[in-house]
């Protein structure tokens, strides 16, 4: 369920601002989106796993706060990111 180092590296290479970027909002939102997608797939099989569902809601909230921060800081970067990730908003 956790992201492997290779998966993280691939996501950071695609969405990071530079090679070693792990802290930009774009990189963090992309990593959270991948984790959210993986957990959502897990919950489709294990419908009664309420502890994981609670953790999923926390991740969604964190992604929402980071998205709001990016939208307030630079709306063009925000729009480009949600287009690339295919997120609603």
Swiss-Prot record:
A GO term, aspect molecular function: structural constituent of ribosome
InterPro entries hit by this protein: Ribosomal_uS15, Ribosomal_uS15_bac-type, uS15_NS1_RNA-bd_sf
Any Gene Ontology biological process: translation
Keyword terms of this UniProt record: Ribonucleoprotein, Ribosomal protein, RNA-binding, rRNA-binding
CDD domains: Ribosomal_S15p_S13e (cd00353)
CC per GO annotation: cytosolic small ribosomal subunit
Family to which the UniProt record says this protein belongs: Belongs to the universal ribosomal protein uS15 family.
Subunit field text: Part of the 30S ribosomal subunit. Forms a bridge to the 50S subunit in the 70S ribosome, contacting the 23S rRNA.
Physiological role: One of the primary rRNA binding proteins, it binds directly to 16S rRNA where it helps nucleate assembly of the platform of the 30S subunit by binding and bridging several RNA helices of the 16S rRNA.
UniProt name for this protein: Small ribosomal subunit protein uS15
Name of the gene this protein is made from: rpsO
């Amino acid at each position: 369920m956790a992201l492997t180092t290779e998966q993280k590296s691939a996501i950071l290479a695609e969405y990071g601002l530079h090679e070693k970027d792990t802290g930009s909002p774009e990189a963090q939102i992309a990593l959270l989106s991948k984790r959210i997608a993986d957990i959502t797939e897990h919950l489709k099989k294990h419908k009664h796993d309420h502890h994981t569902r609670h953790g999923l809601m926390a991740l969604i909230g964190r992604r929402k706060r980071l998205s709001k921060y990016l939208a307030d800081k630079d709306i063009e970067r925000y729009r480009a990111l949600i287009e690339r990730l295919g997120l609603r908003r």
